[in-house]
Amino acid sequence: LAAHAEGLQLIWIPPERCTHADLAVLPSLAARLPGLRHVAASYLYRGDDVARINRLDRAAKAAGLAILATNDVHYHAPDRRPLQDVMTCIREGVTIDRAGRLLNPNAERHLKSPTEMARLFARWPDALAQTRIVADACAFSLTHLAYEYPNETVPEGATPESHLAALTWAGAAN
């Protein structure tokens, strides 16, 4: 990564259940990756958010980094959580009634407004300021996005639709 990171702004996204061992690697990462300047901090609504973000802030500062006010977004609006749950079940190969703790416990993984982010991160104003700096440095527009439909890989003699139907029926039979 270090060989290809010139000109990039790197952000360390801690694991959801971040341990002291995870945080202990920050000084080493910061030394080897000059573009690493930030640690992502998100509200996960598990009851430990303030303590967890404070721990991330201390570890980031000790490594010469700063935290960013981020939002672990999985969908754009709370009412899209059921779709996220279905996608999680597909990824994990389980049914919705057996997914249990594989699913997020609430519908808070949606985009938050600037006002809501300011409220959530009022204890860490530097995190909000750093997030603004990173966002302002980004040169992105939705017009840069264009969907490129992938080439269909289907058996000889089949159409994409007939192959999908065959796979669907085979999966349903299992």
List each language-model region with its residue ranges.
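Phosphodiester-processing cores and adjacent nucleic acid-binding clamps
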Residues: 1-174
